[in-house]
Amino acid sequence: LLISAVQLQNLQASGRPLMVFDCSFDLAQPSAGMAQYQEAHIPGAIYADLDQHLSARPGDPAASGGRHPLPSREAFAAWLRSVGFNNAMQAVVYDRQGVNYCGRLWWMLKWAGHEAVAVLDGGLPVWQAAGGAVQSGGGPVPTAPGDFALQTPLRRLVSVDTVQAQLGSAAQTIVDARAPVRFRGEVEPLDPVAGHIPGA
């Protein structure tokens, strides 16, 4: 699940097939993630934008609802191929926000059936503190599309109906990863209703 900065540096030096994804994002300022990426990212990292790459676009088939609906598995796989990703690659995901956004890509890769994916422990701040190299500017341009093919999902997508039907059941655990003030309903900058799902 986690890879340390030193382990990633060793993996880079090994020459094994690897793709690193920068998932930096800011819900309040959607363009801020790309600006952060262009300012500094791990050399060779692909930028994975929550709105553009990790969510269904308006009018496209979606696998879920919500503010950032999941794209279909097929659309997600097409994006992975477009950035040169292959089934043989180790994926490493990171962000600058405490894994808020790279955790989504980790889950989506598992949902696409890809086993070899890890979260960079501590994200870019820890990478830099460990002496990891960074570069600025745009990302790499793939020399050829990847051949990523969907596999049997390693993670399950659960519907809202299923969650509602199992509220209060010991068989279901809901984890709310938002800020404590949003969980308690004291502040809600994005959603029309404040608070959390009962039992979370």
Give residue spans per PLM region.
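Cytosolic catalytic domains that perform sulfur/thiol-centered chemistry
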Residues: L1-G199
